[in-house]
Amino acid sequence: MAKKKKKVDENNSVLATNRKARHDYHIIDTWEAGVVLLGTEIKSLREGKVSLVDSFATIDNGEIWLQHLHIPQYSMGSWTNHTPKRTRKLLLHRNEIDSLMGKVRDGNRTLVPLKLYLKNGRVKLELGLAQGKQDYDKRQDIKRRTEEREVTRELGRRIKGINA
């Protein structure tokens, strides 16, 4: 009996990633948080229009808020459209919020959004506890990546030379 083909699930897809955050910060730990959104924001997200650049999370009165997440207005929306850069509430369990509060207060750490995605039809945000990198750390990462790339390239050449 043949196996069923897997369908591409529109309810589980990545909407945006914050590549700059992984470049500028050491990611210490990650959490999954729900995002409170309006109807036109969801529709705009499903069109793939979102920018995580320069966004961050803050903790106020025991609640986590996402700042500077840019979701453009929905093209088919009318007067009910949302403001593109409004502050959005993140949904986490109380014990997770309390542990995050302690970790952010301890040192020079911040909460950075890493990825925005759909999970079972709900918008989720991968939130990272991050510590800023120095310039020399960034240079070391670039050097390490180029060395790894050269090694894999050389291995590929040698394997092709042996098999050819």
UniProtKB/Swiss-Prot annotation:
Subcellular location: Cytoplasm
Entry GO MF terms: RNA binding
Entry GO terms, CC: cytosol
GO BP term (any one): trans-translation
Origin superkingdom: Bacteria
InterPro entries referenced in this protein's UniProt entry, alphabetically: SmpB, SsrA-bd_prot, SsrA-bd_prot_CS
Keywords from the named record: Cytoplasm, RNA-binding
HAMAP family per the UniProt record, alphabetical: SmpB
Family assignment from sequence similarity: Belongs to the SmpB family.
Task performed by this protein: Required for rescue of stalled ribosomes mediated by trans-translation. Binds to transfer-messenger RNA (tmRNA), required for stable association of tmRNA with ribosomes. tmRNA and SmpB together mimic tRNA shape, replacing the anticodon stem-loop with SmpB. tmRNA is encoded by the ssrA gene; the 2 termini fold to resemble tRNA(Ala) and it encodes a 'tag peptide', a short internal open reading frame. During trans-translation Ala-aminoacylated tmRNA acts like a tRNA, entering the A-site of stalled ribosomes, displacing the stalled mRNA.
Protein name, per record: SsrA-binding protein
Species assigned in the record: Corynebacterium glutamicum (strain ATCC 13032 / DSM 20300 / JCM 1318 / BCRC 11384 / CCUG 27702 / LMG 3730 / NBRC 12168 / NCIMB 10025 / NRRL B-2784 / 534)
